[in-house]
Amino acid sequence: MRKRISAIIMTLFMVLASCSNQLEAEKLAAESKNTFFDSLVKIGQGFQDIFGIFGNAIGDALGFNAVKSDDKRSKVGEHFEGVGEGLKDTKIKLDELLKEVTAAPHADTTEVKSVINNAGAVLTKLIDSVAKLAGATKSEAPIGDAGTAQAAAATPADIADVNTVIEGVKKIIEVAEKSGVKIEKGTAGAQVANANGPKVLTNNAQADANSGPALAAEVDKADPWAMIDKIKMLKLLLHLLHLRLMMTPGQLATGSANAANNGTAATNADLAAAVALKAITKGGKFTQPAANEDGAVKVAAASAVNKVLGILDAIIRKAVNLELGKIKEAVKGIKYSEITGEATESGIDQPITNKSSN
């Protein structure tokens, strides 16, 4: 009888112990899930902060209205600096998000960290390119600087600065294309005769009447995507030899007045891109305008510059948004795992919303 009672007591003890262990395990599991969800909330908030900072930064530096006709070229440098600061702030927030993801318990964050690191590398390359562009566009000369002396000839833009701009544009496009951005070629337009605009960039004497308004009209109808494509396709300018009658943007911007006199632009986009290159780098001056046409030349210069800046901003915005979109999808795939630390991406999907757009 005593043995039976002892057995019953032992059985009850084991049952109670088992129940206690099960309750403790369930409690720990619940706490683990709560910790996991808390971490996801922090990650989601950090992700939203990134979108907010980036959107505000690029929105404040919208390139299509960056400069006015009476601005100095340093205004372009300030624009690039503003874009660069926005990218840097975004990179800082991205690094903070990486720390949150790394610290998240009960989740495998390997894929997410890889995507964040890739996005960080893209931002770093864009920051570097924008910084170089800012350094090459710091001249205190006016955007539409032109000769004022009697029959003043055009003067060439600084080759080193033009090369820096070419390299910067090429690098931004290269990075963006790797991120998945489609770079449009645009419509380049027809060849432009010397009297319809190129004379203002290259002539060795005062420009003829109506050449200033003609240049402004050509720039106004230029396709900004085609302008960027023309700059992208330029080779670095090592010298000024072998100038052709139908000139590229680089030749129109950096050619001497004597060598480039009477030259024509290969296309409308070549002409407009040349105006932008000459208007943002140091050294370059437009030909002395005809009487009362200096305003038209300044308008042409500002319009060309804004078109280039606007498309570059659009490309940068698309590249970063695509990278952030990749992070969003990776974060959505983080799922709960019973294993502490980095485990598997299986269990509970966590949706994250944002207001991004390409």
Curated annotation (Swiss-Prot):
A lipid is attached at residue 19 (N-palmitoyl cysteine). The keyword Methyltransferase does not apply. It is found in: Cell outer membrane. It comes from the Bacteria. The keyword Lipoprotein applies. InterPro entries: Borrelia_lipo (IPR000680). One of its GO terms (cellular component) is cell outer membrane. A lipid is attached at residue 19 (S-diacylglycerol cysteine). It is a lipid-anchor. Keywords: Cell outer membrane, Lipoprotein, Membrane, Palmitate, Plasmid, Signal. SUPFAM superfamilies: Variable surface antigen VlsE (SSF74748). Residues 1-18 form the signal peptide. It holds the Pfam family Lipoprotein_2. Genes for both Vlp and Vsp families are on (usually) unnamed linear plasmids in B.hermsii HS1. Belongs to the variable large protein (Vlp) family. Beta subfamily. The Vlp and Vsp proteins are antigenically distinct proteins, only one vlp or vsp gene is transcriptionally active at any one time. Switching between these genes is a mechanism of host immune response evasion. This is Variable large protein 9. It comes from Borrelia hermsii. The gene is vlp9.
